[in-house]
Amino acid sequence: MAKRCALTFKGPMIGNHVSHANNKNKRRLLPNLRSIKIQLDDGTTKRIKVAASTLRTMRKGA
């Protein structure tokens, strides 16, 4: 399963681990995914993975 938001398609980013000696090693910054149930128009429910930032926007109603 891809680590990607089902609504906004946010996915992993590439960054660096930086030590005190300023050595840089590559790392993946993963989105904060949450599993939620969403009700479809026909009344059935489906489980999708949504980023936490998207979930906050949905709950805010914006």
From Swiss-Prot:
Sorted keywords for this record are: Ribonucleoprotein, Ribosomal protein
Q: Name one GO biological process term.
A: translation
Query: Known InterPro entries for this protein?
Result: Bacterial_rp_bL28, Ribosomal_bL28, Ribosomal_bL28/bL31-like_sf, Ribosomal_bL28_bact-type, Ribosomal_bL28_sf
Which ranges does the record mark as transmembrane?
none
GO CC, one annotated term? ribosome
The reply on keyword Cell membrane is: no
**Pfam entry (one):** Ribosomal_L28
| Record GO terms (molecular function) | structural constituent of ribosome
**What PANTHER family does the record point to?**
50S RIBOSOMAL PROTEIN L28, LARGE RIBOSOMAL SUBUNIT PROTEIN BL28A
What's the family? Answer: Belongs to the bacterial ribosomal protein bL28 family.
Q: How is this protein named in the record?
A: Large ribosomal subunit protein bL28
